[in-house]
Amino acid sequence: MRQKTATITRRDKSFTGHYVPVKPTPIKDPEYVAHSKNLFSELGFADSMAESADFVRMFSGDMSGVPVPMRQVGWASGYALSIYGTEYTQQCPFQTGNGYGDGRAISVLETLIKGQRWEMQLKGGGRTPYCRGADGRAVLRSSIREFLAQDHMHALGVPTSRSLSLYVSKTETVKRPWYSQGSRSENPDMLISEAVAISTRVAPSFIRVGQLELFARRSRSNEHPKAMEELEKIVLHLIDREYADVIDTQLATPEKIVLLAREFRGRLTSMVANWIRVGFCQGNFNSDNCAAGGFTLDYGPFGFCDVFNPYYQPWTGGGNHFSFMNQPNAAQRNFDMFCSALRPLLVSHQQDLLAFDEIQSEFLAVMDTKMKAMWATKLGLINLKTESDKALCNVLIKELQTLMMQAPVDYTIFFRELSSIPDDIGPLKKSFYSNLYNDAADDPDTLALEKYWIEWLEKWQMLLNSTCDAKGISSRASEDIAMQMKLVNPKYVLREWFVMPAYQQATAGDYSLIQELQAVMTQPYAEQSKELEDKYYRLKPLEFFEVGGLSHLSCSS
């Protein structure tokens, strides 16, 4: 929906409109790096298109030659910012919150392909009115991370924006703060020149919770006569783009909003449960990084767990509120801001407002149910028959989380090894970072911990038996459960220490490691070759712990 435009300058104090026309700034001398073969196939594109002159030109930011009826200009959108449920305006150049928005993301195309609507957005396409003094560029390093991550998350079965293509400039660079080799500094300790790149991401829309907040805030403060109308339009546009298949267009607007809240709650809770399932931490889950369509958006300082740690946080500025196991609570704060933004449209519809408030109040209960179901699925306990078995499953989950921290264990490797339903704890040792069973075999604490692991495994095996017939778990049943577990517990995840060599090689024009990672990470549940297993299914080397750019990241991109 682009019914309104807005022109923003440093002097403006109030604004209207849903978008701003922006012409991308092409990168100089673009070179092909990668494209998503899976998405190209879905769209009916030939792989050869990714390196064709017209395609490269457009998706490296040059829209001067686009065919009719396309326009030679894209658009950027404004949004508000809330961090963990608190509204912020401090970094806005106007101190009003009206200066936030797509600082380097420019949408260039909206199209209908095979019945599916897609919006295509350049990331790193140059300055927009929302860049707050920045250059509007993205560097190759961060572009590779996001490109690979979106492809990987889709293959993992996690709702996400999609990667389309990635191009790098052979001659244009910008300076960014980053870490020196082997640095253990919390924040970047040097300034480096990096090649600029443009990646294109694709989704049905890029409407964020923060975008709804922006129009709600304008309505709340009566910034202009059509503020409430613009809020309603952006909400109806969201429904049209993301929820048209589940919300009847003939319903009255208040009824649509109640259904929207219910549907978004379902998508948001499922998405976050999936994040935990695969070990993903978004790192910076502000409302402006929360897609109102209920999918993963904005791969900045994200990371995948190596060692299981509830407080794992890849971003040095993220704090515990965006840490791995607190993501359900962060999601609840974003849902609260979502509801707060929609509520003004219901103030004169009390029955709808009551239903709406009930949906909001039940968020954590729904989230808890999704989380328990997710853990049970990871443990292969999907057919529990009695309430006592379900209660025991919840106890096992809590005990396991404690044991995983005490060992400690590699999150991905542990659950993948457990998926083979081992008879004893031997195979699980592959996931242990502590050398418990060698150097300290006679240590009382080690022996006690080993005893707890054995007891836990026995209780888990007994509960698995209860999901089968009275004769216990058969060989065939065991194989079926193992197969099901291996479909939810990935063997391969995109660890930061896999990605760093890829973007380091890419700076020298060698993209082969990107292609290898793309091939492996788009088949995360497959066994793959012994060579790839030895390379990508292993514990994080000790020398990589606490290293900047490997264990922790800044927002530099």
UniProtKB/Swiss-Prot annotation:
Listed EC numbers: 2.7.7.-, 2.7.7.108
Pfam families: SelO
Catalytically driven reaction(s): L-seryl-[protein] + ATP = 3-O-(5'-adenylyl)-L-seryl-[protein] + diphosphate; L-threonyl-[protein] + ATP = 3-O-(5'-adenylyl)-L-threonyl-[protein] + diphosphate; L-tyrosyl-[protein] + ATP = O-(5'-adenylyl)-L-tyrosyl-[protein] + diphosphate; L-histidyl-[protein] + UTP = N(tele)-(5'-uridylyl)-L-histidyl-[protein] + diphosphate
GO molecular-function term, one example from the UniProt record: AMPylase activity
InterPro entries: SelO
Source organism, top-level taxon: Bacteria
Co-factor requirement: Mg(2+); Mn(2+)
Family that this chain belongs to: Belongs to the SELO family.
Protein name: Protein nucleotidyltransferase YdiU
The species this protein was found in: Moritella marina (Vibrio marinus)
Lineage of source species: Bacteria, Pseudomonadati, Pseudomonadota, Gammaproteobacteria, Alteromonadales
Gene name for this UniProt entry: ydiU
